Curated annotation (Swiss-Prot):
It comes from the Bacteria. Its EC number is 5.1.3.32. Involved in the anomeric conversion of L-rhamnose. It comes from Burkholderia orbicola (strain MC0-3). The gene is rhaM. This is L-rhamnose mutarotase. The keyword Coiled coil does not apply. Signal peptide: none annotated. Pathway: Carbohydrate metabolism; L-rhamnose metabolism.
């Protein structure tokens, strides 16, 4: 299993709605994430910068790239687009983060 992290940006004042929507994550989206190999998925917020920091685990044979092709992922991105920075294709703008330290 590999652990990866990435950063996204939430629009100011949208944290309560972001949390509300994720608290009610669609079951079919959760199923699609798991089917792609995603596990132990966390998203943290830095209130000062409005950055969201996501951390997840994935196996070597993950299918995360294929998620973008699914209807449920595209619908979720459209649903979340008013809350966060997105690219022209509607997906959240993500910046991969480099691991700097790990303690088991």
């Amino acid at each position: 299993m590999e652990t990866i992290a990435f950063r996204m940006r939430l629009h100011p004042g949208k944290q309560d709605e972001y949390r509300r929507r994720h608290d009610a994550i669609w079951p079919e989206l959760a199923d699609a994430l798991r089917a792609a190999g995603i596990s132990d998925y966390w998203i943290f917020l830095d209130d000062d910068t409005h950055h969201l920091f996501a951390v997840l685990r994935r196996p070597a044979d993950h299918r995360i790239a294929q998620l973008a092709e699914t209807d449920v992922m595209r619908r979720w991105w459209a649903y979340m687009a008013d809350l966060m920075a997105t690219g022209p294709d509607g997906r959240p703008v993500e910046k991969a983060l480099e691991p700097m330290f790990h303690l088991e």
